[in-house]
Amino acid sequence: MSKRSAKIAATYFLTIIISLVLIGGGGYLVINKYLNKTPDKSGIDDIVIDDGAAQDAEYAPVFGDGRTVLFIYEAEKSQTSTSFLLARFAPADNKAVLVPLQTDIACELDGTANTLYEFYRLGGTSSAKRAVEKFTGLTVDRYLKFTKDSFNTFADFMGNVEYNIPDNLIFQNPSTGESTVIKSGNQILDSNTLRKVMCYPDYSGGEEYRAKVVGNLAAELLNSGSRGILRDSLDSVFTDIINSDIETDITRYDYDEDKPAIEYVLSNTSEPAQLVIPSGSYNENGCYQLDDTFVDALPRWFAME
């Protein structure tokens, strides 16, 4: 190769090397600047995630949600030791409507006229449920029957309640030998004393007044639990109650289905209980007859229409 050709080749080769260095270095600078560019975070700190809105979106109650449940309490086999209460859980209104039903309510079922207690005594919970459906015109979805022990378990969970005892309550139970001696005035009632007040047979207002006492105590008990253990330990309460000697057709599936609605209500109010006292009069047979105005208003109170 001539000197001139070698010089040209060297010059050409050097030009290529310099070009590669310049281009590669520039490219590296451009790419490095892009890769290491600090993102613009302005405005991110101003974004607030509404956890409450996200939680509410998990369950949104609609009108008509809820169940109607008949509660029966039988401390022993006698009329004044038995209580009935119809409850409607209405999550759309954040409430549980409680209607105490006195044992001497008149009803005609299958051509037989009798009282609620007698239908229950003769036919058990299924007959009591049918009788309540007949004189209220409502469908009872489920029932819960408490014994003395299961009621004490439930009441212990819910907590003591304060109640104004109207009179001195003095009674010696001839069947059990148990004594009741409770002074009038404001009292803090535990589960055992609560039961005695509910089952006291000698109120001056008779069975009609005793039913009102049961309703007021039930409302106080529910609200007490809603401020405490129901809000904090709902699963534990259900498990322990359902595993007691309670009689019910409520299943675990029912509970799991209703749990979001219950939690929704408990998160929105600490006093969901709303008491509705029945109205009526005694008929010629000495049975309490619910008046039509009360019966017609029940669906509205129960948030069903």
Protein language model annotation of sequence segments:
Residues 156-236:
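Flexible, polar/acidic helix-loop-strand segments at domain edges
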Residues 83-84, 125-133, 148-152, 156, ...:
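Extracytoplasmic/secreted envelope proteins and their assembly/folding machinery
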Residues 64-66, 79-84, 93-101, 127, ...:
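Extracytoplasmic
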Residues 2-94, 199, 262:
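Entry/capping segment at the start of metal-dependent catalytic domains
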